[in-house]
Curated annotation (Swiss-Prot):
<dbReference type="Pfam" id="PF00320">
    <property type="entry name" value="GATA"/>
</dbReference>
<dbReference type="GO" id="GO:0000978">
    <property type="term" value="F:RNA polymerase II cis-regulatory region sequence-specific DNA binding"/>
</dbReference>
<dbReference type="InterPro" id="IPR039355">
    <property type="entry name" value="Transcription_factor_GATA"/>
</dbReference>
<dbReference type="GO" id="GO:0061629">
    <property type="term" value="F:RNA polymerase II-specific DNA-binding transcription factor binding"/>
</dbReference>
<comment type="function">
    <text>Transcription factor. Required, in concert with signal transducer and transcription factor sta-2, for up-regulation of the vacuolar H(+)-ATPase and acceleration of lysosome maturation at molt. Involved in regulating hypodermal development, perhaps acting downstream of transcription factor elt-1. Modulates environmentally induced changes in collagen gene expression, including rol-6, sqt-1, lon-3, and dpy-13. Involved in regulating expression of various genes, including gst-4, sod-3, ugt-9, and col-144. In response to oxidative stress, required to up-regulate expression of gst-4 mRNA.</text>
</comment>
<feature type="zinc finger region" description="GATA-type">
    <location>
        <begin position="244"/>
        <end position="268"/>
    </location>
</feature>
<keyword id="KW-0862">Zinc</keyword>
<dbReference type="GO" id="GO:0006357">
    <property type="term" value="P:regulation of transcription by RNA polymerase II"/>
</dbReference>
<protein>
    <recommendedName>
        <fullName>Transcription factor elt-3</fullName>
    </recommendedName>
</protein>
<keyword id="KW-0805">Transcription regulation</keyword>
<feature type="region of interest" description="Disordered">
    <location>
        <begin position="1"/>
        <end position="34"/>
    </location>
</feature>
<comment type="subunit">
    <text>Interacts with skn-1; interaction may enhance transcriptional activation of target genes.</text>
</comment>
<feature type="region of interest" description="Disordered">
    <location>
        <begin position="290"/>
        <end position="317"/>
    </location>
</feature>
<dbReference type="GO" id="GO:0045165">
    <property type="term" value="P:cell fate commitment"/>
</dbReference>
<dbReference type="GO" id="GO:0008340">
    <property type="term" value="P:determination of adult lifespan"/>
</dbReference>
<dbReference type="GO" id="GO:0008270">
    <property type="term" value="F:zinc ion binding"/>
</dbReference>
<dbReference type="InterPro" id="IPR000679">
    <property type="entry name" value="Znf_GATA"/>
</dbReference>
Length: 317
């Protein structure tokens, strides 16, 4: 079998040469390649294949290397036997059987948790009850911590009494006498002296009993005590000898003072305030002038009727 020499100088460009080179490239076998995953599986899962590969390499160097084209053709016709990966279910079962419970509890990683969840769908449902879960691991840690705290506080561990059901039933049947009061257990109290102690002060100390003339306050706070009426002192007659500085009268209803401080009668003072000049003497009267005012108890109609009667009586006269 002739081997193709790829290093010979190529002839000038032509249609025939290009077609020949294309056919030669198409007929050239492509060596098989392995993915990274298959290579890892070869090294980790199939140790026998690794030894076989090392033996074949030793024979290869001892016998001599064949030509490159013959090696490529042999690989294309008869590819090397690849490692057969185990099934997913078998792999899950093997991993679950190989992992011990102690190691599983010591390292609860997320990978173990993921493998466990996938394996639960593949294994028998009765096996799932005995298989620990990630939540069980956390609960076991919490329970162990609580039991340790209880053992620190109490002299006897409570877990031993809780695990034994017979002891639990016995404790329920036993009477609980902690809160029962038994007077026979207590000694009777005997006072040292039988004579009563004398009272220091037998008389009552309440202020109501000590005061003889005390009057208690009224019971109803809303009822106020009657207050005595204050008597108004009589006004001092300071104007008994007063004389009006304008009209020289001694009788008036009210004495007033002008701007200069002089004493004036009521008529003269009001006239000055209204007209801004002194009251003339021609307007002076001997008596006190009063207005004709109706009484407070009289109605206005009766007052008008009385005025008309007076005017009619005066006209008849």
């Amino acid at each position: 079998m002739e081997t193709a020499n790829y290093y010979l100088p190529s002839p000038p460009y032509s249609s025939t040469s290009s077609s020949d080179s294309r056919e030669s490239r198409m007929n050239t076998p492509i060596p098989t390649t392995y993915s990274e995953e298959n290579v890892n599986s070869l090294f980790h899962l199939m140790p026998d294949n690794t030894d076989q590969w090392m033996t074949s390499q030793k024979n290869f160097w001892q016998e001599g290397s064949p030509s490159s084209s013959e090696y490529l053709h042999q690989q294309a016709v008869q590819p090397s036997q690849q490692a057969r990966l185990p099934g997913i279910s078998n792999f899950m079962k093997d991993s679950q059987l190989s992992v011990k419970p102690a190691a599983y509890y010591c390292s609860p990683t997320m990978n173990d948790y993921r493998v466990e969840k996938v394996a639960n769908t593949l294994l028998d449902p009765y096996v799932q009850l005995d298989q620990p879960t990630y939540a069980d691991f956390t609960n076991a840690q919490v329970l162990n911590h609580q039991q340790e705290m209880l053992q620190m506080n109490f002299p006897t561990p409570l877990s031993t009494s809780y695990m034994n059901t017979a002891q639990v039933t016995q404790t329920h049947q036993m009477p609980f006498n902690i809160f029962e009061l038994n007077l026979s257990n207590f000694a009777t109290f005997q006072p040292a002296c039988d004579t009563p102690l004398p009272l220091l002060n037998s008389s009552p100390t309440h202020p109501y009993t000590t005061m003889s003339n005390f009057t208690p306050p009224p019971q109803d706070p809303l009822v106020a005590e009657p207050k005595p009426m204050k008597k108004r002192m009589a006004a001092v007659q300071c104007h008994q000898n007063s004389i009006c500085s304008n009209c020289k009268t001694r009788e008036t209803t009210l004495w007033r003072r002008n701007g200069e401080g002089g004493v004036e009668c009521n008529a003269c003072n009001l006239y000055f305030r209204k007209n801004n000049r002194k009251r003339p003497l021609s307007l002076r009267k001997d008596g006190i002038m009063k207005r004709n005012r109706r009484p407070r108890n009289e109605s206005p109609n009766s007052a008008i009727r009385n005025t008309h009667q007076r005017h009619g009586h005066a006209a008849a006269c």
